Amino acid sequence: MPPKTRAAGAKKVRRKEKKNVAHGHAHIKSTFNNTIVSITDPSGNVISWASAGHVGFKGSRKSTPFAAQMAAENAARKAQEHGMRKVDVFVKGPGSGRETAIRSLQAAGLEVGAIQDVTPTPHNGCRPPKRRRV
């Protein structure tokens, strides 16, 4: 009897492993249109993530502080399943969901250590978009 082989189109599925990480980093990227929350271990491997669009908001509602709050709660809940208890927060971008996302990480049960703003500022690099005329 010949050895069993995989079907031509079948892929090898990597099972999601349960990491047990007590301390990590929460990266909050808050733009004018969306808020993305990624929770990583100290070396930068993503443990959980959520965004306002991923949580179920569409269009202009993605840019609201409430959408950022829901995204942060969702990411924190997933991270706590992996044993996360304490995070250092890195905030990037000018969006409206920055403070709300940090507050909801605390409310979800994660202990927030340091909060750092890592918004990139150009040393006169690219030309910015033109001013809106409404």
UniProtKB/Swiss-Prot annotation:
GO terms for molecular function: rRNA binding; structural constituent of ribosome. Keywords: Ribonucleoprotein, Ribosomal protein, RNA-binding, rRNA-binding. One of its GO terms (biological process) is translation. GO terms for cellular component: ribonucleoprotein complex; ribosome. It comes from the Bacteria. Belongs to the universal ribosomal protein uS11 family. Part of the 30S ribosomal subunit. Interacts with proteins S7 and S18. Binds to IF-3. Located on the platform of the 30S subunit, it bridges several disparate RNA helices of the 16S rRNA. Forms part of the Shine-Dalgarno cleft in the 70S ribosome. This is Small ribosomal subunit protein uS11.
